């Protein structure tokens, strides 16, 4: 069956957008709020009609992720792009471990479905919701291992709010990685279809 590289590229961009947001948070203590809202909102899309629907039905919402994907596909082994590559690949590894653990998958689904009650009272990007999302990551994803080592400013990384935002963003990255697998993504494509993925990202960016 022919792969749908449009959907695969969108889901990859979702993973990369989360990776870039983690990098921003770790180094600067803040990040692009619109880009953050896009990936966090995707966590709540448990039965989307399309891949793009996970990201609000708007390619523009994944601009950061598409640009980051291009950087990752062209990355050297050092520097900021290498950091992004490591986060992206680490999220893919954790998704595979999650997928192999039915109990963890069920727990994750239950915990995410419970968020609706809180969202009736709190904004998605509120400290309360960030703490709830971070707790899901800590309770369900972290035990699957290996832990993702986040590099950044030690002073910034001491902030409990920044820590919560990073974990919430990593959880959103896992959601995109699940989607990526569902639409036919594989790590082999990152080795053998890099050019095709790069051109697909370029094509989407060209008409945003």
From Swiss-Prot:
The keyword Nucleotide-binding does not apply. It holds the Pfam family DUF489. One of its GO terms (cellular component) is plasma membrane. It is a peripheral membrane protein. It comes from the Bacteria. It is found in: Cytoplasm; Cell inner membrane. Keywords: Cell inner membrane, Cell membrane, Cytoplasm, Membrane. Its main location: cytoplasm. Belongs to the HflD family. PANTHER family: HIGH FREQUENCY LYSOGENIZATION PROTEIN HFLD. HAMAP family: HflD_protein. This is High frequency lysogenization protein HflD homolog. It comes from Yersinia enterocolitica serotype O:8 / biotype 1B (strain NCTC 13174 / 8081).
């Amino acid at each position: 069956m022919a792969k749908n590289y449009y959907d695969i590229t969108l889901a990859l961009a979702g993973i990369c957008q989360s990776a870039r947001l983690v990098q921003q948070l770790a180094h600067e203590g803040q990040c692009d709020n619109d880009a953050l809202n896009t990936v966090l909102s995707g966590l709540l899309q448990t039965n989307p009609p399309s891949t793009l629907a996970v990201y609000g039905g708007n390619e523009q919402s994944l601009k950061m992720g598409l640009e980051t994907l291009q950087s990752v596909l062209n990355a050297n082994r050092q520097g900021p792009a290498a950091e992004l590559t490591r986060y992206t690949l680490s999220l893919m590894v954790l998704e595979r471990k999650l997928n192999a653990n039915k109990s963890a998958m069920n727990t994750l689904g239950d915990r995410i479905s419970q968020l609706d009650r809180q969202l009736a009272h709190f904004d998605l990007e509120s400290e309360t919701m960030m703490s709830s999302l971070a707790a899901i990551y800590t309770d369900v994803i972290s035990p699957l291992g290996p832990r993702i080592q986040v590099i950044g400013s030690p002073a910034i990384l001491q902030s409990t709010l920044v820590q919560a935002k990073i974990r919430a963003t990593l959880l959103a990255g896992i959601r995109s990685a699940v989607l990526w697998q569902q639409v036919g993504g594989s790590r082999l494509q990152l080795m053998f279809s890099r050019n095709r993925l790069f051109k697909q990202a370029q094509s989407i960016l060209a008409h945003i």
